[in-house]
Amino acid sequence: MSSNSFPYNEQSGGGEATELGQEATSTISPSGAFGLFSSDLKKNEDLKQMLESNKDSAKLDAMKRIVGMIAKGKNASELFPAVVKNVASKNIEIKKLVYVYLVRYAEEQQDLALLSISTFQRALKDPNQLIRASALRVLSSIRVPIIVPIMMLAIKEASADLSPYVRKNAAHAIQKLYSLDPEQKEMLIEVIEKLLKDKSTLVAGSVVMAFEEVCPDRIDLIHKNYRKLCNLLVDVEEWGQVVIIHMLTRYARTQFVSPWKEGDELEDNGKNFYESDDDQKEKTDKKKKPYTMDPDHRLLIRNTKPLLQSRNAAVVMAVAQLYWHISPKSEAGIISKSLVRLLRSNREVQYIVLQNIATMSIQRKGMFEPYLKSFYVRSTDPTMIKTLKLEILTNLANEANISTLLREFQTYVKSQDKQFAAATIQTIGRCATNILEVTDTCLNGLVCLLSNRDEIVVAESVVVIKKLLQMQPAQHGEIIKHMAKLLDSITVPVARASILWLIGENCERVPKIAPDVLRKMAKSFTSEDDLVKLQILNLGAKLYLTNSKQTKLLTQYILNLGKYDQNYDIRDRTRFIRQLIVPNVKSGALSKYAKKIFLAQKPAPLLESPFKDRDHFQLGTLSHTLNIKATGYLELSNWPEVAPDPSVRNVEVIELAKEWTPAGKAKQENSAKKFYSESEEEEDSSDSSSDSESESGSESGEQGESGEEGDSNEDSSEDSSSEQDSESGRESGLENKRTAKRNSKAKGKSDSEDGEKENEKSKTSDSSNDESSSIEDSSSDSESESEPESESESRRVTKEKEKKTKQDRTPLTKDVSLLDLDDFNPVSTPVALPTPALSPSLMADLEGLHLSTSSSVISVSTPAFVPTKTHVLLHRMSGKGLAAHYFFPRQPCIFGDKMVSIQITLNNTTDRKIENIHIGEKKLPIGMKMHVFNPIDSLEPEGSITVSMGIDFCDSTQTASFQLCTKDDCFNVNIQPPVGELLLPVAMSEKDFKKEQGVLTGMNETSAVIIAAPQNFTPSVIFQKVVNVANVGAVPSGQDNIHRFAAKTVHSGSLMLVTVELKEGSTAQLIINTEKTVIGSVLLRELKPVLSQG
């Protein structure tokens, strides 16, 4: 074989080694076939001879065969002396393979490896980067304390190597040296600090791993490199991403305040709506002050989001745990889709992902409810996957989906996998405990399972029924009698013990059956399982105390049998019971209370998820999987009450930028920044910090100069950002002035558009919009003042026009007022059009034009029909005389433009006054908000009152659960909106309708064919039926056979376009176009039967 036949590449060495090993087997001498009977003395002798040969081709062939043996898992350690002699070979291919071998066996053959240490040291200076890296790997694999100084020196030199591959191996060597000699920690930290500043993506993951192993508590080393790591994250290799994300998760928990308080505080602030002006002002101030996300916090969340699409399951899981632990709860929902995608992987990945989903679904059900069907069990799933899916389905069960889940569970009970069937029965029991509405249904189903042929199913059903009956023992005497009959057929000890315990607890309710059961059990006492024997003793004791005449002798007989039982637990229990229930001279005071002790009411067992207590472990870790703290686990710290100084993450700025700034500039910027809303500061500053490391550093440095601003990091104004870019553009020279300005303004516009998009996402209030309009004025003023005197007169006039136009436009923005009746008029909401990068003056002139001249206008209109149908909120029987009904008035909600208005009518059907009617505890899905009505002091007998509420359903038909309370009672009530009430009617032209419909195609379009009598397809009938189901507006149509309706969703403002196209005969096609595909599908299902019926 020639030396060029198998070129060895370090990157793919493992795969080639395997192939070489396969070829090697064919060249072994025939005697190797009888290796079982031959002597081991001459084993591998041919390889040793080839390694000692003078020919490089023979040596290379031998090394390939040896590496092939290693790849197959065979022991090649006896060849170490022969291999190590070739470490100084001049052939680069041989040297690479020798180092691969030495890395594997240097730790086992330390003495022989030490003989060649001088060769390794020389190799550290080799021109080939692979040889330098391999030499360092071998050197760090020789775990002998005597060479620690040599290793330390080699690591320091390698950390400054020009090759990032060598620096990467230096980071790997740090961990090995630290485990060999922990006393080198301080010197190694210096190397880690140096490598953390490395800008190569190849080094980042390895050095962070070294940091986690050596000094995970040295958070100060991360400060200056935090933004760089966030920006490099997407380009780092996959396994490095995992390590970095876990480290940054811990870092964020120590450096930023909790983002989870925001929603709670806003919800609390919304409770007291009608208050005095002073109180309202205090509430508004509170709403603004509590929490603003740090731009660096936002940077981390935004830069990890793309990694949810990674092909590596570990990366996706790492990002998911980061979002779970440090992102606002409203943003954590995006991880659910990615985690569900991982369920298509192999079973090992599924197991870990399902465990993490099980933990998440306990705290935030809403995240995974849309993907309920993804957790249905498949026949091909292994048992461990099936039980985890059952756990998740149980956690996601609620009143809305329990009927579907119970049908699914019925199928699972019939499974051939008995362990899975038993787990399903346990799940049904938990559902019955958690959802009281289906407790009786589940109990009846479990009783039916008692007649199942499979004994394991019957036994598990008995155990679960016993737990359910403890919740309501007085109501189910018949079930207890039925279970008593099963004692003759059931042999599973746990089930027999459960039946005996139930009979003993309810012996007074079944006085005739209990003694007979005890008689039967006395006959078979000696052959029963220990668990059953204990319950027989308990049953005898309880009957002795309640029915002594019939069972006294029987109990004494059982106690005598227990006295001589082989199990010491049985004997101990027998002595205890005898002393307690059979009075004698030696009996103490306890015997007086024997009845209270044995027949005391026991609390019902609490059926909880086994994943309930795992949330204190970081998701995705070994500790979370095992539910025990593993070696090396680093706990997540609690959020700090006050955020540490954010300036520690600022990188030093270059001196040039400081010198160029004109005098007085900083003052103007400071005064302008006072007008900025907090949400704008957060979004824009985080945007600019993500552009590049140098930009984030320089901008942070400028902020550090100002000294007066603590928390704000960067400028948030679109005009000031374009101004800064244009000023930096002028430095390049007068001839490039115009070009640089044009580019900088275009960039400023795109940045501002990004900022606006993020502001929409963060749902900024109207007050922040007012502030942003004042920012525009102030920033345009500062820009016009900073223009140099050399600018032309026409430019100055243009600036004045722009300023005047903006000032004219500013008063149009106004605060929302409760008494402002104009809010009920149709609100004009123009369709957003893409903004080209125009000059500021032209932009100002265009913005000053009236939008009414545009042909593309979509505005909210008044409802075409208001249904009078009411829904029962609280029945008078359930409400102890208080009845409540609600309906949807289809008018704009005065409590918020994203809320659906609801009117509730309360009736007092009693002959007494009902006092203090108010809303109590709210159990709303994630993201949903509710504005409650003011408490009603009293409601007279036969009196009635109507109140208004607002609920933001987040464009979903999820149920809003809350408590309607009086002075004495609280009642659980639910409001589930019809999908048609989540819409606002809009007025638009046929042209605009077709244009929008052309955009919303593909997955955004759902359709169905309707069959009905011709008289049901007249325009008036179609109109009446559609507006009765949904709050939509009619769109003028130029064709008689096509009827169009349009609306937008209340929460997000997404268009909902409905088309009814009449076909030949008695058929029609119903088409719905919308981005909200779920709502569109539900609306289609509701409209189809209404349009079909006569």
Curated annotation (Swiss-Prot):
Residues 1-11 have a biased composition (Polar residues). Subunit of non-clathrin- and clathrin-associated adaptor protein complex 3 (AP-3) that plays a role in protein sorting in the late-Golgi/trans-Golgi network (TGN) and/or endosomes. The AP complexes mediate both the recruitment of clathrin to membranes and the recognition of sorting signals within the cytosolic tails of transmembrane cargo molecules. AP-3 appears to be involved in the sorting of a subset of transmembrane proteins targeted to lysosomes and lysosome-related organelles. Residues 1-31, 268-292, 662-811 are annotated as: Disordered. SUPFAM superfamilies: ARM repeat (SSF48371). InterPro entries: AP3_beta, AP3B1/2_C, AP3B1_Ser, AP3B_C, AP_beta, ARM-like, ARM-type_fold, B-adaptin_app_sub_C. This is AP-3 complex subunit beta-1. GO terms for cellular component: AP-3 adaptor complex; axon cytoplasm; clathrin adaptor complex; clathrin-coated vesicle membrane; early endosome; Golgi apparatus; lysosomal membrane; membrane. Residues 678-696, 705-726, 778-791 have a biased composition (Acidic residues). Belongs to the adaptor complexes large subunit family. It is linked to Hermansky-Pudlak syndrome 2: A form of Hermansky-Pudlak syndrome, a genetically heterogeneous autosomal recessive disorder characterized by oculocutaneous albinism, bleeding due to platelet storage pool deficiency, and lysosomal storage defects. This syndrome results from defects of diverse cytoplasmic organelles including melanosomes, platelet dense granules and lysosomes. Ceroid storage in the lungs is associated with pulmonary fibrosis, a common cause of premature death in individuals with HPS. It comes from the Eukaryota. Pfam families: Adaptin_N, AP3B1_C, AP3B1_C_2, SEEEED. GO terms for molecular function: GTP-dependent protein binding; protein phosphatase binding. SMART domains: AP3B1_C, B2-adapt-app_C. Residues 765-777 have a biased composition (Low complexity). It is found in: Cytoplasmic vesicle, Clathrin-coated vesicle membrane; Golgi apparatus. Residues 666-677, 727-738, 748-764, 792-811 have a biased composition (Basic and acidic residues). GO terms for biological process: anterograde axonal transport; anterograde synaptic vesicle transport; antigen processing and presentation, exogenous lipid antigen via MHC class Ib; blood coagulation; cell morphogenesis; clathrin-coated vesicle cargo loading, AP-3-mediated; establishment of protein localization to mitochondrial membrane involved in mitochondrial fission; granulocyte differentiation. Phosphorylated on serine residues. Pyrophosphorylation by 5-diphosphoinositol pentakisphosphate (5-IP7) impairs interaction with KIF3A. Serine pyrophosphorylation is achieved by Mg(2+)-dependent, but enzyme independent transfer of a beta-phosphate from a inositol pyrophosphate to a pre-phosphorylated serine residue. The keyword S-adenosyl-L-methionine does not apply. Keywords: Albinism, Cytoplasmic vesicle, Disease variant, Golgi apparatus, Hermansky-Pudlak syndrome, Membrane, Phosphoprotein, Protein transport, Transport.
